[in-house]
């Protein structure tokens, strides 16, 4: 799915794609290197959500470049749904958003993290097999050291944050 909405109107396709996956207890994991421009988009989303007051009943994790260090804290939330947010070269214009299931993670080039997000999710699945894990990937514009977050990526993060802040499962 491509995020082509450049107005301030809600992106209904993106909203539906995200909210259709939200079942039970939710954890959102931001992955990325904040000193490498758009690669730090995962932690930036967590910061945006926290600055807006967090999300009731949702666990937020800024995992930086070492998500494997958060396996036990994530599992301790007993979440049913885990959403990873990371920069990835998805071959689209900067700021484009794609949602991937686990079976597609190994086919996408995720930013600068070792070990791969796939290994991380495999370890989580070992701890809780029925957890629904998916990835929201955003096409970066610049991942150079010291580069700022691009306007395109920041706009996509604000849209995603808007979706979560407006979401009401009842």
Residue ranges and their predicted role:
Residues 1-140, 147-158, 163-169:
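N-terminal catalytic or cofactor-binding beta/alpha core of small enzyme domains
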